[in-house]
């Protein structure tokens, strides 16, 4: 067994020395010479010179005419005039939405009934910020999202 471990140790050392030269980092930019980079830069400059600018290809007036024609062809809906801030009588009375007009007495009666219901609710429901319950263990509940303290008066 001693000879086997000696052979394995020497084999591992041999592999370590052989692979040492191959494990160096080879950056990508190291394989490209400066001359090649300059050639690429010159080629890019020549291509940019040959490519016309967008403004030179089509004047802005032609672009705006073309865009209006395309908009008209693409939008099947008629254009809606801008809102002037005036409300017609049907909208003012709530007729446009199918609702009748509410007078102030109806509104105040509704608000009063909601406030009474809120005040009539138990104090624990009004002031605890609970939104659910959670089962910690079988038979043991704890409040989920509830305040950890109680209000005292």
From Swiss-Prot:
In the UniProt record, does the keyword Phosphoprotein occur? yes
Q: Where in the chain is the site Cleavage?
A: 123-124, 130-131
Which Gene Ontology cellular component annotation is one that this UniProt entry carries?
Answer: perikaryon
Q: Where is this region: Important for degradation of atrial natriuretic peptide by IDE?
A: 147-151
Q: Where is this region: Disordered?
A: 54-105
Q: Which residues form the propeptide?
A: 26-123, 93-103
Listed under GO biological process in this entry are: cardiac muscle hypertrophy in response to stress; cGMP biosynthetic process; cGMP-mediated signaling; female pregnancy; negative regulation of systemic arterial blood pressure; neuropeptide signaling pathway; positive regulation of cardiac muscle contraction; positive regulation of heart rate
Where in the chain are disulfide-linked cysteines found?
A: 130-146
* Modified residue annotations for Phosphoserine: 129
PTM comment: the record says:
The precursor molecule is proteolytically cleaved by CORIN at Arg-123 to produce the atrial natriuretic peptide. Undergoes further proteolytic cleavage by unknown proteases to give rise to long-acting natriuretic peptide, vessel dilator and kaliuretic peptide. Additional processing gives rise to the auriculin and atriopeptin peptides. In the kidneys, alternative processing by an unknown protease results in the peptide urodilatin.
**Signal peptide stretch:** 1-25
Reading the lineage from the top rank, the first entry is Eukaryota
Pfam families named in the record: ANP
Statement: the UniProt record of this protein carries the keyword Phosphoprotein: yes
Record GO terms (molecular function) = hormone activity; hormone receptor binding; neuropeptide hormone activity; neuropeptide receptor binding
Keywords from the named record: Cell projection, Disulfide bond, Hormone, Phosphoprotein, Secreted, Signal, Vasoactive, Vasodilator
Q: Which InterPro entries match?
A: Natr_peptide (IPR000663), Natr_peptide_CS (IPR030480), Natriuretic_peptide (IPR050787), Natriuretic_peptide_atrial (IPR002407)
Task: Name the family.
Answer: Belongs to the natriuretic peptide family.
Family matches, as PANTHER family: ATRIAL NATRIURETIC FACTOR PRECURSOR, NATRIURETIC PEPTIDES A
Q: What is this protein called?
A: Natriuretic peptides A
Q: Which organism is it from?
A: Equus caballus
